[in-house]
């Protein structure tokens, strides 16, 4: 489970369980990924109830994304082409997009046209 996007009420019991698991994970000395490991333990081992959102709520496969020119938005590459809610620039391979806000992505549109688009939200 990727925790790039998640939400909890401030008084949710999940926070205390997650903090307990995070303290345990940090004792191992490896900081990177500890938050994610702790959340996975919280959900799958401690069996805290959650609602897992679909991938279009936290999309991180940029090379598989499509663009709907008629709606001017990124969409899933497969039917029914849900609108992508959040594009998660996770991992070193996306550093060029994370550090250069003007970097354009070559993306295939639903009309099978290659177009250049900014991966970032632009009003």
Predicted segments, located by residue:
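A glycosyltransferase accessory/donor-loop signature
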Residues: 2, 10-123
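Substrate-binding/active-site groove segments that recognize
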Residues: 6
């Amino acid at each position: 489970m990727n925790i790039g996007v998640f939400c909890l009420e401030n008084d949710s019991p999940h926070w205390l369980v997650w903090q307990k698991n995070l303290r345990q994970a940090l004792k191992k000395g490896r900081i990177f990924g500890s938050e994610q490991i702790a959340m996975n333990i919280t959900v799958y081992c401690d069996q805290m109830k959650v609602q897992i959102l679909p991938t279009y709520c936290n999309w991180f496969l940029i090379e598989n994304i499509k663009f709907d020119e008629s709606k001017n938005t990124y969409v899933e590459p497969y039917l029914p082409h849900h609108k992508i809610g959040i594009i998660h620039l996770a991992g070193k391979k996306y550093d060029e997009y994370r550090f250069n806000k003007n970097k354009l992505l070559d993306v295939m549109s639903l009309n099978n046209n290659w177009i250049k688009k900014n991966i970032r939200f632009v009003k």
